[in-house]
């Protein structure tokens, strides 16, 4: 159905932190992707790492993240890893690593866990090592509109959500809200459809980490 609409699917490998089990199935999983036209995967490691005693940011897991990226490169598959270690430029060596989460992304905003200044700091910390899948694009900021029992509020605006597509660099961007919310603001959603994913030139015009940031970017291969 997606192919009939000209849409490519991205597979999600949520490992539930069962890493050895994931490694045992990597070749079959990647081959299944190739056979069925998937060329990208979003991997996740939610929970305490199995085997017990290993941790998300330890050497053992760092070796695993690298192994998964190398294995994906063998199958010409792009990787967007969540709950992984903050990158340190590895995407230069393995450009199929098109993004990582590796910091508090948009999901924490619904938990009330990100301060409003959080995204003025990330470009000088997390994003130094590589692109970040921040998953912006939340248009409905009142969580009780979806779940009456949840009175949390995303401390943001539509304008700020759109700005994140430029400020939080990633060659893979998400539209993280539901279609019904985008249908209410089609003019704003048009920006998400049109905004570039990669850039020829970037200028940080002004910034005070923790307070504000102004970025100008030139879209790759165009005059935009």
Can you describe what each PLM-predicted range is?
Residues 142, 147, 155, 188-195:
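C-terminal catalytic/substrate-binding lobe primarily of soluble NAD(P)-dependent oxidoreductases
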Residues 156, 205, 216-217:
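Residues embedded in well-ordered secondary-structure elements
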């Amino acid at each position: 159905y997606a192919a009939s609409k000209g849409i490519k699917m991205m597979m999600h490998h949520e490992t539930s932190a069962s890493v050895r089990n994931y490694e045992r199935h990597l070749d079959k999983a990647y081959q299944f992707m190739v056979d069925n036209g998937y060329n990208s995967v979003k991997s996740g490691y939610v929970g305490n790492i199995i085997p017990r005693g290993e941790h998300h940011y330890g050497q053992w897991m760092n070796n695993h993240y690298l192994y998964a990226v190398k294995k994906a490169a063998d199958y010409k598959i792009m990787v967007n890893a969540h709950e992984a270690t903050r990158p340190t430029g590895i995407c230069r060596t393995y450009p199929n690593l098109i993004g990582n989460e590796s910091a508090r992304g948009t999901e924490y905003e619904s938990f009330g866990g990100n301060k409003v200044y959080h995204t003025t700091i990330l470009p000088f910390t997390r994003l130094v090592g590589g692109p970040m899948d921040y998953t912006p694009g939340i248009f409905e900021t009142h969580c009780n509109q979806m779940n009456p029992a949840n009175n949390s509020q995303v401390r943001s605006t539509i304008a700020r959500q759109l700005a994140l597509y430029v400020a939080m660099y990633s060659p893979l961007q998400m539209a993280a809200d539901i279609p019904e919310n985008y249908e209410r603001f089609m003019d704003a959603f048009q920006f998400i459809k049109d905004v570039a994913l990669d850039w020829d030139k970037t200028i940080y015009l002004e910034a005070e980490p923790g307070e504000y940031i102004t970025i100008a970017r030139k879209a790759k291969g165009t005059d935009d």
